[in-house]
A protein has these predicted regions:
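Short, non-helical or kinked segments that cap or interrupt transmembrane helices
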Residues: 1-2, 43-52, 105-112, 210-218, ...
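Early transmembrane hairpin of solute transport permeases
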Residues: 1-85, 225, 246
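Hydrophobic alpha-helical transmembrane segments
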Residues: 5, 17-25, 84-89, 107, ...
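Hydrophobic core segments of alpha-helical transmembrane domains in multi-pass membrane transport
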Residues: 6, 27-35, 52-66, 84-100, ...
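Interfacial segments of multi-pass membrane proteins
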Residues: 9-12, 98, 218-233, 238-244
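C-terminal ends of transmembrane helices
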Residues: 30-43, 94-103, 170-179, 216-224
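Helix-loop-helix hairpins and the membrane-proximal interhelical loops
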Residues: 75-77, 106-191
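Membrane-embedded helical hairpins/re-entrant loop segments and their flanking transmembrane helices
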Residues: 159-230
Length: 247
């Protein structure tokens, strides 16, 4: 999740990826604790609070987004007009389809924007297929490739973010069940979702995966389609797993 990027960049400069992964495990444990006691603390986080948290997280990502639009830190052509043109075209397509599109076009606005941006970048010769051509068809992740280290200050910083993201999850789950099922989530549903969020991040750390979140952008898709069947999300998860081992 981009919500962790600023903190992870700071940790990476002073330490390494293994330190981030160790802190991620601690953060996952914090999320599990929040999930276990969600029934007792839920009243402390009304929609006004959770909505504000989601909004604040979104605002904090603008510097990272602008940096990526310029080409990414360390890029030889950082800030070039080609980078900005590709970024602006992609942004315009996503925004236009999201606001004015209907049905499939609206739901697929991000995917279509990526495809359009990719085609434009291809025209500028900004796409290098050499790594794709040399990559194996199937490649499994190596557990603990970067190792796992526990550094107190890093653990505290990431743990705080996980606690905040757990509160964001309350807002995400509430908006999802309201939009998809016309009701608020039960305490058991919130607890299971947040505990699952924590467990998945702990497992993810052992496979060198960086922190994830509950992703507010998916709320709109569920609200629009009303699709909440576990089978659908299970199939989507399997597709992602297969994509993960086919770089």
């Amino acid at each position: 999740s981009f919500a962790y990027v600023p903190i992870m960049q700071s940790i990476a400069q002073d330490a390494d990826v293994g330190t981030i992964l160790g802190a991620q495990i601690v953060g996952g444990i914090v999320a599990i604790i929040v999930g276990i006691f969600i029934k007792q603390i839920r009243h402390l986080f009304p929609p006004l609070v959770t909505g504000t948290v989601v909004f604040a997280i979104g605002l904090s990502l603008y510097p990272t987004a602008v940096n990526y639009m310029a080409g990414g830190a360390g890029s030889a052509d950082y800030g070039s007009w080609q980078n900005w043109l590709v970024a602006i075209i992609t942004l315009a397509v996503v925004t236009g389809l999201n606001h004015f599109g209907k049905g499939f076009l609206k739901l697929s606005s991000v995917l279509i924007g990526i495809i359009v941006g990719y085609v434009v970048a291809l025209g500028f010769g900004m796409v290098d297929f050499s790594s794709v051509l040399t990559a194996k068809w199937v490649q499994f992740p190596q557990p603990m490739h970067f190792g796992i280290k526990f550094e107190p200050s890093s653990c505290v910083a990431i743990a705080v973010l996980f606690a905040i993201s757990s509160i964001q999850a309350i807002g995400d789950f509430s908006a999802t069940t309201t939009g998809g099922m016309d009701r608020m989530p039960t305490d058991e549903e919130l607890s299971g979702g947040i505990i699952g969020y924590g467990v998945s991040n702990i497992v993810c750390a052992f496979f060198s995966g960086l922190p994830t979140a509950t992703y507010s952008q998916n709320v709109g898709i569920v609200s629009s389609t009303k699709v909440v069947a576990k089978r659908v999300f299970g199939i989507a998860a399997m597709i992602m797993l297969v994509a993960g081992i086919m770089p």
